Amino acid sequence: MSDIPVSKRAARIEYAIRDVVVPATALEADGHEIIKLNIGDPIAYPGLPTPEHMIHAFQESLSRGETGYSPSYGLTELRSAISEDERAKGWSCTPDDVYVCHGVTEALQIIFTATLEEGTKVLAPGPHYPPYMAYPQLFGAQTIEYRLNADDGWRVDFDDVEAKMDENVRLLVLINPNNPTGNVAGPEEIDRLISIAEKWPNCMIIADEIYDELDFTGTQKSVASRSLTVPVFTLNGVSKVYYAPGWRIGYMALHDPTNRLGAVRDGIERLLRSRLCASTPAQMGYL
């Protein structure tokens, strides 16, 4: 009998840094030595442990029996703490603007689900984190890469961004600091990207700032703190700065300076409720 067919959506999905593990694991089982450069897991390297106070808080949460469901948008105390952190970065974030997710990757899935339709586009830096390419395909959307100039420290090529923007671009992505190049966009570059996005009324910015505290240049700034016009989804979490990628705890924070995200916010909240919640003990560890 022939195989039961897989959905076209699933068949299209590729995730290069994980997909390569399948043949590599087979080779390793055959006795070959494999040098693993595919995924940046800080826990895989000596000297980068998850902070002890976070582990203790996680364990204490388990000891107290806090293993039930949390609110779908995240623990109230954690949302409040995150909003304080974001306000310290220069914008008026409230606890209601913060949504706790199963890592930044789930936050991306929810944002894409709430904003993309057939024929829409995501404009993301090339190179970038694979989900920016993979997940939009589920919705019949397309990811277009804008150029990072290797001869100029991997800075954003703004002429290329301008040339690739159109009315179908719903999401303009800035990963800052950038993964994998390490480039840090400063305030002037952020302002220029915002000025491009604001020419297109239906365009929103994704500010992936998961590496923000690993900036050693002193130039990294919150995109939300710079935008007076364009809606911004700020993404962050525990995976990189706190060396806890396996906890799968991250968040999105919505900056809506001109009050245009009402319908999108409603869609995001519906999606969050439909998937129940993020891990309660892991949230307590983050808190």
Give a label for each model feature.
Residues 3-6, 10-103, 110, 277:
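N-terminal small-domain helix-loop-helix segment of the aminotransferase-like
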Residues 27-30, 139, 199-201:
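Helix C-cap/helix->beta junction micro-motif
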Residues 55, 228-287:
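Conserved core segment of the aminotransferase class I/II
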Residues 63-198, 212-226, 233:
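Conserved core of the PLP fold type I
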Residues 176, 205-206:
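Residue-level marker for buried hydrophobic side chains located in beta-strands
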Residues 209:
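Walker B catalytic acidic pair
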